[in-house]
C-alpha cells in the first residue's frame, strides 16, 4: 500500500469512528496488513498491539483481542503511524463522554535485546511482565499498582508471574515506544501503559505458538486488564461500571454464532441417554429370574441414528480459532471435548470400553460421597412408608398432568414447544430428551410422587431447556459441558421443595452411588444386584437399579443425582442465588461465568423460574436448606 493509499484509508476509518461512536454503535474494521480495529461500544480506554517489523511475533496480537476495545496492526508500511492516528481519533471522540480522560494500554512481547524479568524456558514457562508508564499531567501510580497486583496473580505451568515496573521516563522497548507523543497525550488528557510480555507462548523462532499456553495467558491477562480498566474508569472517568466483568465485550461477532450453531447441531444429532437405554429390559428380567439370578441375558439397543465417526468429523472441523472472546472460547472448547467423549461412548456401546469413557465423562465416586450414600442406606429404613395418598396412576394420567404443566409455561412464552409422549420401549423411567418428556407406557406413578416428578422433569429439565432456548446461545438449551450434575441435583431438590421426597427415593439415590462405585471397581452385574439386595431392596428394585448402572456397558451417570444434590445444598447453604441456576443447562462451575456474561449483557436473566418456587411451603423448605439442612434431614 502506498503512503497516499494509507493516508486515505486512515482518514476513511477515522470518519467511521467518529460517525459510529457518535451513535453509540460498534466499530469493527480490518486494517491493512492483517490488522484489526474493534470498538464494542464507547469506552474510555483501548488495548493496542503493533507487531514489530524486525522480528517474528506470533500470537502477541491475540493478547489484546480479549478486550471490548482493541487495535492491532503491523509496524511496516505505515501501520504504526496509522494505529497512532486511529487511537488519537478514538480518544478525541469518546473522552468528552467520560470526563475527558483516556487510557491506552499497549502490549508487546519482550524484544531479544531486553533482559528477561525472570529466567524462563520452553519446558518450564515462567510468565513475567515489565510495565512502562507515561502519564503527563496526571498520576496513575494507583492504576499501575492494581495492574501489577493482578498480573502477579497470573499462573502458567504452576509458576506465578513476576512483574517489574519502570516508571515515567524509563526506556521503552525498541519500536514499542509510546504510541502517541507526550504532547499529544497531554492534549488528549490521555495516559499510556506499555506491558512488555515474556513470550512464553512462542515456539523457538517466534513463528508459531504453544496453543494451550497462549490460551491460558490470554484469559488471565484479559482478566488483569479488566481489573485495571475498572479501577481507571472508577477513579478518572464518569463511567462507573457495575463491576470489572461489565467492561468486557458485549458485541458477539458472527464467528461465535456460527460455532454455537455448529456445536448445537452436533449435540442435537444424537441422544446419549436414549441410545444407551436397553429396549429389551422386560425379557432380560424374565431370563435373569429364570436363571435364579445367576446369569444376565444380553441387553439390546436401538440402532444409532447418527454415525459417530462422521459426527466427530463435523465436530473437529468447527473453526474455534476464529473466536476472540476467551470466556466464550473456553465454554465452547469444554463442550467440544465432552461431545467427542460422548460420541466415542456411542462407538463403544455394549463393550468394556464404554465404562472407561463413562468414568472419564462423569468421574469416579469419591469416598465422602460413598460414605454419605452408605449412611443413607444404613440409617433410612427400607420399610418406612411415606406420608400421603396411596395408590398409583397410569402413564396416560401422568402425561395429562404433565401436559397441563407445560401449558402453564407456554402461556408465559409462546416459544415453549415442549411435548409429553407416552411411548413403549423406554425402561429407565421418566426421561427428558431435549424438549420432550418421555413416559414409559407401562409406568405406574405413585400418587404421592406425581407432583414431585412433574417438578423434577418439567420444573427443572424442561424449564432450563426453554430458558436456554430463550438465550442468544443455543448451547444453553443443549447444555454446557458437565451440566447434568447440577441439573439432577436441582431436580432432586425440587422433589424435596414440593414435599415429594420419600425414604424410598432417597435410598434409591444412595443405592445408585453404591452400585456405581462397585461397577467402577470391577463388580459384575450379579455382584451389584446381590449387593443391593443385601441393603434391603427387592429383587425387582435391585434389578432395575443395576440395569440403569450397567446400560451401555457401565453408565456411571447415576452417581450424579446424589452428588449434584449435595452440591446444590452446599451452594444454597453458602448463600448462593437460586435464579442463576435456571438460566439454562449449566454446571456449577459455570455460575461465575454466567454472572460475567450477564454483566456484559451477553446473557439475560432466566425468562421464568419453576412454578413451584412461588408456593409458600416451597419457600419455607428453601429457607431451611439455606440454614444448613443435611441430606438426611430432607425427609423431615
Place the predicted regions along the sequence by residue:
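Short pre-active-site segment immediately N-terminal to the catalytic Zn-binding motif
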Residues: 439-454
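Post-HExxH zinc-binding segment in Zn-dependent metallohydrolases
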Residues: 477-516, 564
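Long, charged/polar, low-complexity intrinsically disordered N-terminal extensions
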Residues: 1-153
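Extreme N-terminal flexible tails
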Residues: 177-187, 194-356
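Contiguous, non-catalytic segments that form substrate-binding/exosite surfaces or channel walls
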Residues: 310-442
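Active-site His/Glu-centered metal-binding helix of metallohydrolases
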Residues: 454-463
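Post-HEXXH active-site segment of zinc metalloproteases
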Residues: 286-287, 448, 463-487
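Conserved alpha-helical "signature site"
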Residues: 505-636
Amino acid at each position: 500500500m502506498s503512503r497516499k493509499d494509507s493516508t486515505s484509508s486512515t482518514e476513511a476509518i477515522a470518519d467511521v469512528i467518529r460517525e459510529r461512536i457518535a451513535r453509540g454503535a460498534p466499530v469493527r474494521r480490518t486494517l491493512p496488513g492483517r490488522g484489526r480495529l474493534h470498538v464494542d461500544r464507547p469506552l474510555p480506554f483501548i488495548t493496542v498491539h503493533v507487531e514489530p517489523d524486525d522480528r517474528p511475533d506470533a500470537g502477541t496480537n491475540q493478547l489484546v483481542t480479549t478486550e471490548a476495545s482493541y487495535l492491532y496492526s503491523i509496524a511496516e508500511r505505515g501501520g504504526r503511524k496509522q494505529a497512532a492516528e486511529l487511537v488519537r481519533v478514538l480518544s478525541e471522540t469518546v473522552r468528552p463522554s467520560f470526563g475527558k480522560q483516556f487510557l491506552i494500554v499497549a502490549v508487546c512481547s519482550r524484544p531479544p535485546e531486553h533482559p528477561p524479568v525472570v529466567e524462563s524456558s520452553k519446558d518450564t514457562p515462567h510468565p513475567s511482565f515489565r510495565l512502562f508508564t507515561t502519564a503527563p499531567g496526571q498520576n496513575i501510580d494507583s492504576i499501575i499498582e492494581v495492574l501489577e497486583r493482578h498480573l502477579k496473580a497470573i499462573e502458567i505451568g504452576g509458576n506465578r508471574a513476576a512483574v517489574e515496573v519502570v516508571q515515567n521516563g524509563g526506556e521503552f522497548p525498541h519500536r514499542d515506544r509510546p504510541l502517541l507523543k507526550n504532547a499529544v497525550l497531554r492534549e488528549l488528557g490521555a495516559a499510556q501503559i506499555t506491558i512488555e510480555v515474556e513470550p512464553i507462548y512462542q515456539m523457538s523462532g517466534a513463528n508459531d505458538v504453544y496453543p494451550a499456553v497462549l490460551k491460558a495467558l490470554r484469559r488471565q491477562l484479559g482478566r488483569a486488564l479488566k481489573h485495571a480498566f475498572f479501577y481507571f474508569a472508577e477513579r478518572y472517568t464518569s463511567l462507573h461500571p457495575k463491576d470489572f466483568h461489565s467492561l468486557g465485550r458485549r458485541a458477539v461477532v458472527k464467528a461465535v454464532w456460527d460455532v454455537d450453531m455448529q456445536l448445537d447441531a452436533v449435540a442435537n444429532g444424537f441422544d446419549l441417554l436414549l441410545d444407551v437405554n436397553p429396549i429389551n429390559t422386560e425379557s432380560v428380567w424374565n431370563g435373569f429370574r429364570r436363571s435364579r439370578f445367576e446369569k444376565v441375558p444380553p441387553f439390546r439397543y436401538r440402532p444409532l441414528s447418527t454415525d459417530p465417526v462422521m459426527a466427530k468429523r463435523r465436530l473437529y472441523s468447527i473453526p474455534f480459532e476464529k473466536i476472540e472472546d476467551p470466556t466464550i472460547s473456553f465454554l465452547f472448547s469444554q463442550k467440544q471435548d465432552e461431545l467427542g467423549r460422548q460420541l466415542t461412548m456411542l462407538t463403544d456401546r455394549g463393550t468394556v470400553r464404554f465404562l472407561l469413557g463413562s468414568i472419564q465423562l462423569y468421574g469416579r465416586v469419591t469416598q465422602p460421597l460413598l460414605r454419605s450414600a452408605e449412611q443413607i442406606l444404613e440409617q433410612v429404613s427400607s420399610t418406612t412408608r411415606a406420608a400421603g395418598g396411596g395408590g398409583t396412576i397410569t402413564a396416560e394420567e401422568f402425561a395429562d398432568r404433565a401436559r397441563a404443566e407445560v401449558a402453564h409455561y407456554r402461556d408465559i412464552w409462546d416459544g415453549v414447544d415442549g411435548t409429553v409422549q407416552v411411548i413403549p420401549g423406554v425402561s429407565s423411567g421418566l426421561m427428558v430428551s431435549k424438549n420432550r418428556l418421555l413416559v414409559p407406557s407401562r409406568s405406574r406413578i405413585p400418587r404421592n410422587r406425581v407432583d414431585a416428578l412433574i417438578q423434577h422433569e418439567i420444573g427443572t429439565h424442561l424449564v432450563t431447556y426453554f430458558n436456554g432456548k430463550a438465550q442468544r446461545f443455543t448451547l444453553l438449551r443443549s447444555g454446557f459441558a458437565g451440566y447434568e450434575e447440577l441439573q439432577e441435583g436441582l431436580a432432586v431438590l425440587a422433589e424435596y421443595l414440593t414435599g415429594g421426597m420419600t425414604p424410598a427415593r432417597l435410598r434409591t439415590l444412595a443405592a445408585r452411588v453404591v452400585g456405581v462405585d462397585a461397577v467402577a471397581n470391577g463388580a459384575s452385574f450379579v455382584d451389584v444386584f446381590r449387593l443391593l439386595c443385601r441393603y434391603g431392596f427387592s429383587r425387582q428394585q435391585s434389578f432395575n437399579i443395576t440395569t440403569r448402572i450397567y446400560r451401555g456397558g457401565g453408565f456411571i451417570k447415576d452417581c450424579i443425582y446424589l452428588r449434584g444434590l449435595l452440591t446444590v445444598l452446599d451452594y444454597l447453604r453458602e448463600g448462593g442465588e437460586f435464579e442463576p441456576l435456571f438460566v439454562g443447562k449449566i454446571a456449577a462451575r459455570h455460575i461465575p461465568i454466567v454472572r460475567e456474561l450477564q454483566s456484559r449483557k451477553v446473557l439475560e436473566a432466566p425468562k421464568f423460574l419453576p412454578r413451584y418456587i412461588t408456593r409458600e411451603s416451597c419457600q419455607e423448605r428453601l429457607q431451611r436448606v439455606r440454614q444448613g439442612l443435611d441430606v438426611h434431614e430432607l425427609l423431615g
